[in-house]
Amino acid sequence: MFEVMVIGGGPAGLSAALTLGRQRRRALVVDSGKPRNAPADEMHMFLSRDGFPPAELRRLGRLEVAGYSTVEIRDALVTAVSGEIDDFTVEFADGRSERARRLVLATGQVDVLPEIDGLATLFGKGVYHCPFCHGFEAADRPLAVLGGDFSQSMLALYLADRFTKDLVLCANGGLEVGPELREALSRNNIPVREEPVVRIEGEDGALTIHFASGEPLERSALFHRPGQRQHTDLAASLGCELLPDGCVQVNAMQQTTIPGVYAAGDTARLAEPPGPTPFVITGVADGTKAAIWLEQDLFRASVEVPIPGTK
């Protein structure tokens, strides 16, 4: 039996594994090899690694974790999890299973894009979701935002405030906001095209947005804030409480509502903030926190002294 199983081999999972390895815990990291930021060539806001390739960060992270003899990394797909604290069973797609005393869920989320021809192909390479991650590189160029709801309209206002004065909101079938937000868009000189978007083609720096009617729109980059869903249903199957946006609810120690189950990265968040902060560097921090408090959990169980304020 492993002391800890970390499900997910991205920044959060590897960070948790690194911390556990340094405490000489017998841990298994299970990596499906499907990171959310796979389309991205660069990551940002990571001190000393600004502009670094995410895939290279994962490669180096795996090498560091592999340097600790008590930690094993396994490329596999988890299909089911069951059990309770001190005796969880994790099943794999190849028919094997392993047991662990504690779990860290770092399985991440999946972006859900509108079904528009060319959008998925260009996502991360001309079509971007985050102004913090990609706004600087797109500054002072003709930009567009895709979508007509509150979130996309606020994204358009933010980009116009921080990065460009040449921005078009492509509402993709209709602007679904109230008069105050419509007035804000007008006041900030953001034109709105409400025709449905049918196709996007080109490359980063030279996109063409085609509509169901009217002239195509030439832009340097397109921003869109997609919906998300959990990459797996493992947390739900264990009974972990989920927040309205689908994130796994955790406390300040990255504990879920199920004893012995921790969660880290963009799969989880505190209930109090209005939304997640799904950045690589915050995922690393979450993974470290989860491992530190999980370590304390195992230690206190060993010496039979509970952590104050925990179940």
PLM regions: where:
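A conserved FAD-binding loop/helix module that cradles the flavin
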Residues: 17-18, 155, 264-311
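Short, hinge-like loop/turn segments at secondary-structure boundaries
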Residues: 45-48, 144-146, 185-188
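Active-site glycine-rich loop that binds ribose-phosphate moieties when present
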Residues: 125-132, 145-157
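FAD-binding core/adjacent interface of flavoenzyme oxidoreductases
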Residues: 1-4, 72-141, 248-257
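FAD-site-proximal beta/loop scaffold in flavoenzymes
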Residues: 121-137, 227-281, 293-296
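Beta1-alpha1 glycine-rich phosphate/pyrophosphate-binding loop at the start
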Residues: 2-59, 142, 151-175
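A Rossmann-like FAD-binding core segment of flavoenzymes
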Residues: 59-92, 97-100, 163-249, 299-310
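Short, well-ordered coil/turn residues at beta-beta hairpins
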Residues: 8, 106-108, 113-115, 146, ...
